[in-house]
Amino acid sequence: EAMRGCGGGCDFCDVNKRSKKDLPLERLKHEAKINLDYGFDSIWLHSDEMLLYGCDNREFVPNRDAITELWRGLKSLGPNFIGTTHMTFSGVAADPKLIHDISEINEMQKNGRWLSTNLGIETVAPSMVKKHLGVKTKPFSTDEWGSVVREGAKILNENHWFPAATIIIGWPDETPDEVQYTIDMMTDFRATNFRGLVAPLLYQDFSEKNSMHFGNLNEAQFTLFWKCWENNLRVINDIIPIILRNKTYGPAMKVFMYGIIKAGTWAIMRYLRGLCKDLFNGRTPDEIVEKYARSRSVSAPKIETKRL
């Protein structure tokens, strides 16, 4: 654990209630060395928002010096790489050079390695961002969030980071036009050959009556769910060769993983086709998705990333 707390203030998340705490490099080196001596060959830093490590300002601009010092200090112990569990797209877009620097410390361009990290998108509809995402978009404005996510995804891919992102479907106060913003983002991801997974999560509330269930999806929400899994199917097919080339796994494990991945994605798409027919009087996903194929949302303003 490298740090805890994020201060983002999202109204659906308990993590933002934690006080922020950064653990010092010497302690992290001590803990990492125990694992390396035990036989592990890499270091994974758990965090609620790694790019806030050492942050010393209220605008949430990443502290590049503190983070690169952390990466270099841990890399000096001899691991193959240092990964992290969580980042934010706003932190990535605010300092592209930081992402380049930690990738360079990991020698990711040199050895071709890709690392995954978790990031929350949740929604890119400006009105929903203002209502629910607190200050998650800092140092950018809430109106810029859609462009921040697109730019952040591009920066991560350019530096061999594989985003595992989440979105939330079925907010109680969400309209179809607001869902369209996120549908358009998924369309843009496909057009730019985005390499990353997007997990669609149904909104869950402390009150059961306000929680979303599959049987309550409207056409726009189903379209977004479908678009996410279309993206995931495309990306999974793209990364299977990477898995097969991975020397960590033996031939039997590679065959097993290939089978699980293919069978799992096939089962999910089959379930969604059946769900579509049940929800919308026998209509197919293609018929539903076609209605939302053309952009109806207002594009978020283009951003100038704050290069520090």
PLM regions: where:
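Canonical Radical SAM [4Fe-4S] cluster-binding loop centered on the CxxxCxxC motif
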Residues: 1-27
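Catalytic cores of alpha/beta
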Residues: 98-102, 172-188
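Conserved, mostly hydrophobic/aromatic
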Residues: 28, 119, 186
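Conserved SAM/AdoMet-binding glycine-rich loop
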Residues: 33-163, 169-171
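Radical SAM enzyme core and accessory elements
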Residues: 227, 231-308
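Flexible glycine/acidic-rich beta-alpha junction loops that bind and position SAM and/or redox cofactors
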Residues: 8, 44-59, 122-134, 169-177, ...
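Acidic-and-aromatic substrate-binding clefts and catalytic sites of carbohydrate-active enzymes
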Residues: 21, 28, 90-97, 171-177, ...
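C-terminal, active-site-flanking charged/polar segments
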Residues: 34-35, 145-146, 184-195, 203-205
